[in-house]
């Protein structure tokens, strides 16, 4: 139960963070492109139930934000779109999923059920953002708790919601 509560709390924080990227703006009459969110988690294999639980909670949060008109940006209100990618719990699959997500226009990558996958995604996102600054991606880590992710491997494009394992 505690694990579910912590997961729920982290996912709620992800939704709030997405809202915090907003700036007060009026909605223009034309439809703006949505903010693309990519969830990269193990949706198959031994931890599929954990990935599916994360997906259910994020779908609920996205629907709630969109029901209120989306997130306010400088250009106006934008809806959120959540796309799921199955990493199968493997780092190589996570990297393949990241490339697919970026190619599909993802602006935010969400992952958290594996510190190993988080580490490879952090590195790949930093390299991508250096190579293609016009297509930057932000990594939202809601549960990977390896202390190295915010210590020796820390980078600007990684935001972690949870305390690390040493805390």
Task: Map each language-model feature to its residues.
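Extracytoplasmic ligand/sensor domains, especially the bilobed periplasmic-binding protein
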Residues: 107-167
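Signal peptide-proximal N-terminal region
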Residues: 30-32, 56-82
